[in-house]
Amino acid sequence: MKRIFLLIATNMAILLVASIVMSILGVNTSTMGGLLVFAAIFGFGGAFISLAISKWMAKKTMGCEVITTPRDNTERWLVETVARQAEQAGIKMPEVAIYQSPELNAFATGPSKDNSLVAVSSGLLYGMNQDEIEAVLAHEVSHVANGDMVTLTLIQGVVNTFVIFAARVVAGIIDNFVSSNDEEGEGLGMFAYMAVVFVLDMLFGILASMIVAYFSRIREYRADEGAAKLAGKEKMIAALDRLRQGPETGAMPASMSALGINGKKSMAELMMSHPPLEKRIEALRAH
């Protein structure tokens, strides 16, 4: 899903702003308490801002057309199915939208269980049968009902804080080491220090992405189980099998990727937001 690029860009912007602000205010590794506070403010602040604007961002980046008044039987069925599943799951009716894309995919987003959006691609809508689409919708409704949007935001906030804090602590250690071995004791200097911080942000960011991806994969299994309860296990297995036979998905904006039905394949499973479809099918059959 098109999440990866937007997530990286958003977090890199947060880290860059954090670096600039901390440099201006003179926050450094000698004031660990201040550094940690700033790291938490930027780490959680950026994550929650992304959550707050997630529906708006999804509509803009994906070109989602929200169904306010169904124009045909297909749209009417979509809205009625989501409404029924939302009632079963005990959540407020999400907005339902369609976005134009040939890929078989869908996603859920929004700041809370009572303020969410479920969107399906035109490719999925016309490339699957009703039972399979019903299961996909149930998967997305389960994401909303499980509170996955807030959960993943909290996890993202924690790892953002870790990246901001750890990168600057390590950069401070390197700066002190260079200073102690420099006759003039000048250390790295501002620009070299910021360059080191940027590189460390990238390295720690990769580790942080693995952590977020791990929790995202766990939430996918839970959403599959929820979909099996709402729509039926065989329908969910059929939907996953259909996705497995279809073409590989394109890149979905980062803010939607973890809560979609199908993730992009990766050479390293550690970086995948979704477990392989084969494993998801096996997990459902085991229950």
Swiss-Prot record:
Its EC number is 3.4.24.-. Its main location: membrane. GO terms for molecular function: metalloendopeptidase activity; zinc ion binding. The keyword Cell wall biogenesis/degradation does not apply. One of its GO terms (biological process) is proteolysis. Binds 1 zinc ion per subunit. Pfam families: Peptidase_M48 (PF01435). It is a multi-pass membrane protein. Belongs to the peptidase M48B family. PANTHER family: PROTEASE HTPX (PTHR43221:SF1). This is Protease HtpX. It comes from Shewanella pealeana (strain ATCC 700345 / ANG-SQ1). The gene is htpX.
